[in-house]
């Protein structure tokens, strides 16, 4: 796989699970002899929601919720066939969204 890069984008709501999955991918890729760029932390997307506390009166009384989406990017430069096989067999934690681009 000469001259090809693999870009892996990871998304999760919990940054601890995301960092653990990133470390797992990095250690697997290094063990198989590939070079890695990253992990690069991307900006955290924060979605905020404001709702009324009461169902019908007290418009001034509101409650705010937020949902944070943490993201990381990894680039694997010149992966070996063993690297691709190891990444395919890797079992990551639930709650981590993985996008792989060649």
UniProtKB/Swiss-Prot annotation:
Pfam annotation, one family: Ribosomal_S10
This protein's UniProt keywords: Ribonucleoprotein, Ribosomal protein
Molecular function as annotated in GO: structural constituent of ribosome; tRNA binding
Record carries keyword Ribonucleoprotein: yes
InterPro entries noted in UniProt: Ribosomal_uS10, Ribosomal_uS10_CS, Ribosomal_uS10_dom, Ribosomal_uS10_dom_sf
Example of a GO biological process term: translation
The keyword Disulfide bond appears for this protein: no
GO cellular component, one term: ribonucleoprotein complex
Subunit structure: Part of the 30S ribosomal subunit.
Function: Involved in the binding of tRNA to the ribosomes.
Similarity-based family: Belongs to the universal ribosomal protein uS10 family.
Protein name (record): Small ribosomal subunit protein uS10
Record gene name: rpsJ
